[in-house]
């Protein structure tokens, strides 16, 4: 199979925010996963796990969404500020019915953002909160001058305003965020976003709550009634091979279920195409971005764990889903401005799993490591034939071509030749991950069963690079031209 790469032409920039992450007050994502508190014996800096922070910085995390998720539309931010011993508790009704002590609040979130060196995406409460509550939260976070909320922030120990790049006006308001009709939410969005004020010269990117999967009527209604008041419109889509009620095991599955999982991941392409077409009717300049701020695999919770904690193992199959989906996002880079995989630690398709002091990087983490070269790179058009089980991305940054390939077949090797318009000078780097079985994964007893290795099964001749891509693998090769 030969694929011709048009590397002398300019393409669309792949927003680094496509590689965003999501941390909800859910299970052990925040508590134990990211935040252990200042008094924990687990090594931490101001309460944040040092090992987890360093691992996320290694994959160049660009943005983190918080506090939810369904939790966002129950969260009242004033309960999470001030001395920890005085903070109100609440019951996390969506996720396990546990009592939330609110020790991780606004100040702690922005401390985490500072340590991660990434941007903040805060999700406001429309479902059970007031316009005033949301407005005051924005003021508390971003107001540098003299004001009631800025003064309150200073009383709580933080003199300067923080930078909040993204703000979500509600979450899943078609469901857990209020069971609203799109017409009703569109009016609420128009009202609430009015009071997401910009203090100073730092613009806040406003994200409207968008559709669940293929609810094209929701997208149509929001765009028709409020597109000029939003910067982004969200979309949520999860992959669960057996269906919503019985989602299937993360570890025990057969080849047919592997195939269904990959096919469902590929459905993201149709979703983005159809939602984009609706948005194009009202926004032909494609100013409003699609914000896929919840995506990934969602399997049945691991046996013996709280089903409300959504803890699942992560295998090479999850790595296939990650690569397939990221390649689709790149294809739709003109419209997809941000995406946030669910979730960062210990929940759903996590990058990292923790158990006490132990930490494991998942196969999905390694895909984000392999693909980080595409952040803010330009897509490159190509044409040619390839197998139905091959998906790839080609991008360039300065004089380097980055080629990432996923072979989600369960057996056999695919031979691919990529032909450039100019000669190849050298191979800067070639790395990959591969599974020796369909459920290959890392756990606390075997933390490195799936790791990034050097990829050597390639040949370069003049303007061509030939690859022998094994089954169940994801690779990235970087070439200078």
Over which residues does each language-model region extend?
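Non-catalytic accessory regions flanking glycosidase/transglycosidase catalytic cores in CAZymes
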Residues: 1-232, 268-269, 273-301, 305-481
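Histidine-centered catalytic micro-motifs
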Residues: 235
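Active-site His/acidic residue clusters
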Residues: 238-259, 305
